C-alpha cells in the first residue's frame, strides 16, 4: 500500500503496512467477534467501567444478524469470557447460552441494531465520567485532539425517563443517535457504536476519557472559556483519529496487552 491510498493513521506508520484482517468464514468471524467482545468486557472492567450489574456491549452474529451476543446478566465484567456469552434476539429471547439477559440491554441495543444495519457492535455502561458529564446535558466540546474523534459525530439524548426497560425508549435513543458513532444520554451515560467490537469499545473508552478531560479543564478554567480546536483542524484530526480503522487499531493495542496478561477470557 502506498501513502497515496493509505488512511491517515496508516500513513503515520513507516515500515510494515498496517492493514485490517482479511475476510473470514462465518464460524471464524463469529469466534473472532466473541473473543473481541469478551476482551472488551475485561478491558472495561480494568478501566473501572463496571457498576454493579449495569452495562452491556453487544455484537451482531455474522450468520443471524437479527440476533446479537452480549454479557450474561449478573456476571462482573472482569469474569466475562467467550464461553459464557449469550445470544439473544431482538425480543430479548435467549437463543444460545445458559444465563439470564439484562432486559435493559435488549431494550436499548435491539433498537439501535434495528435502526442501524451498518452497526456491528454497541456499547453502554455507567462510567463515572460519562455519567457526570451527561448531567450537563450538552455534547463534548472540541478541546483536544482526542475529542476530535467525535467531531460532528456525536448526539445528545436530552431526556431521562428512568431505567430503560421498554422498546419505545430504546427507539428514541436510536433516533437521537441517528447516523453518528456516539450519543450522550442525559443523566445516564454514554453509548457508542461501530462497525466492529474493536472500534465501538475504543470510542467508548475515548469518549469516557474525553468527558473526564473536559470536566478537569472546566474546573481549572474557573469560569474562563476553554480554547477549542478550530474547525479546519477538527476536520483534519477527525480524518486521523475518528475513522473506523483508527478505532480498530487503537483497541488492538489493549487487546494484545490483555492476551499477554490474562488470556483466560478466550476460554
Feature locations, PLM:
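N-terminal low-complexity or amphipathic/hydrophobic leaders
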Residues: 16-91, 249-252
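Class I SAM-dependent methyltransferase SAM-binding "motif I" and its flanking Rossmann-like core
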Residues: 128-165, 169
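Short beta-strand-to-turn element immediately C-terminal to the catalytic PLP-Schiff-base lysine
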Residues: 60, 87-88, 133-134, 193-194
Amino acid at each position: 500500500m502506498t501513502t497515496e491510498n493509505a488512511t491517515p493513521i496508516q500513513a503515520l506508520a513507516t515500515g510494515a503496512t498496517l492493514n485490517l484482517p482479511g475476510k473470514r468464514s462465518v464460524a471464524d468471524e463469529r469466534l473472532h467477534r466473541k473473543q473481541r467482545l469478551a476482551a472488551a468486557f475485561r478491558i472495561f472492567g480494568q478501566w473501572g467501567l463496571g457498576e454493579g450489574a449495569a452495562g452491556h456491549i453487544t455484537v451482531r452474529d455474522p450468520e443471524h444478524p437479527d440476533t446479537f451476543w452480549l454479557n450474561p446478566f449478573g456476571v462482573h465484567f472482569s469474569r466475562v469470557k467467550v464461553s459464557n456469552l449469550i445470544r439473544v434476539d431482538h425480543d430479548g429471547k435467549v437463543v444460545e447460552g445458559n444465563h439470564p439477559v439484562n432486559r435493559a440491554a435488549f431494550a436499548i441495543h435491539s433498537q439501535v441494531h434495528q435502526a442501524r444495519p451498518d452497526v456491528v457492535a454497541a456499547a453502554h455502561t455507567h462510567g463515572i465520567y460519562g455519567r457526570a458529564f451527561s448531567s450537563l446535558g450538552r455534547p463534548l466540546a472540541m478541546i483536544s485532539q482526542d475529542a476530535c474523534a467525535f467531531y460532528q459525530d456525536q448526539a445528545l439524548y436530552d431526556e431521562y425517563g428512568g431505567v430503560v426497560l421498554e422498546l419505545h425508549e430504546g427507539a428514541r435513543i436510536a433516533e437521537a443517535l441517528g447516523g453518528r458513532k456516539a450519543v450522550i444520554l442525559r443523566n445516564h451515560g454514554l453509548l457508542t457504536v461501530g462497525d466492529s467490537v474493536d472500534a465501538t469499545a475504543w470510542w467508548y473508552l475515548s469518549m469516557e476519557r474525553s468527558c473526564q478531560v473536559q470536566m478537569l479543564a472546566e474546573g481549572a478554567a474557573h469560569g474562563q472559556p476553554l480554547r477549542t480546536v478550530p474547525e479546519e483542524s477538527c476536520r483534519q484530526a477527525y480524518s486521523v483519529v475518528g475513522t473506523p480503522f483508527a478505532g480498530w487499531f487503537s483497541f488492538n493495542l489493549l487487546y494484545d496487552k490483555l492476551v499477554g496478561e490474562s488470556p483466560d477470557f478466550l476460554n
